[in-house]
């Protein structure tokens, strides 16, 4: 991220962990036999903590999403959106046809809403809820204008049980309307 958001005047460069640390696992946790040891004294900026209730594993906050799901199409909803969603992110969550770590556990196939919170230590956390489900496998979200968003689906089965007779993907329109 430092190549996108450079440190401000007088700030030290930030290190987000790669390749020494992934998510919220400590740098000493070697994910792979070839994972290098972190240089001594290197401080990492931890990722955003996902407080859930959606997208977490084992009921615990995590710095990622569930196993076997992937975030897609991150969109900020600012002015022009109803108060319930204004100043939040929406992110597609592409499901996998591999079950999660729990028995009969599926993840993804939805759009998540992420409400950001600044924590006392200056880090960020997100309250993540399922916003739109079930979907096929959302692969992108495209804001067209304030109050209008398109969601692109890859295919339309919404769980691992409906593998037969897949329908082609589709484009969904999400439109904010005024209350009467």
List each model region and its residues.
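Residue position within the beta-strands of beta-propeller blades
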Residues: 91, 150-153
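Conserved catalytic network of the ASCE P-loop NTPase/AAA+ motor domain
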Residues: 143
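Beta-propeller and closely related beta-sheet repeat lectin domains
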Residues: 72, 139-140
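Beta-propeller domain segments
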Residues: 1-129, 146, 158-180
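Conserved loop/turn at the beginning of each blade in beta-propeller domains
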Residues: 67, 134-135
């Amino acid at each position: 991220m430092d190549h996108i958001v450079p440190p401000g005047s007088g700030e030290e460069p930030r290190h987000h962990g790669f390749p020494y640390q992934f998510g919220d696992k400590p740098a000493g946790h070697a994910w792979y036999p070839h994972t290098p040891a972190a240089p001594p004294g290197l401080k990492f900026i931890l990722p955003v903590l996902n407080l859930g209730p959606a997208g977490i594993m084992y009921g615990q906050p995590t710095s990622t999403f569930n196993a076997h799901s992937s975030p897609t199409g991150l969109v900020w909803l600012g002015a022009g959106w109803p108060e319930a969603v204004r100043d939040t992110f929406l992110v597609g969550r592409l499901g996998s046809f591999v079950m999660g770590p729990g028995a009969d556990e599926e993840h993804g196939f939805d759009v998540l809403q992420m409400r950001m919170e600044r924590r006392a230590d200056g880090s960020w956390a997100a309250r993540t809820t399922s916003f739109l489900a079930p979907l096929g496998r959302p692969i992108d979200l495209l804001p067209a204008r304030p109050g209008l968003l398109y969601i692109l689906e890859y295919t339309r089965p919404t769980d691992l049980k409906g593998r037969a007779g897949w329908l082609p993907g589709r484009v969904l329109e999400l439109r904010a309307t005024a209350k009467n």
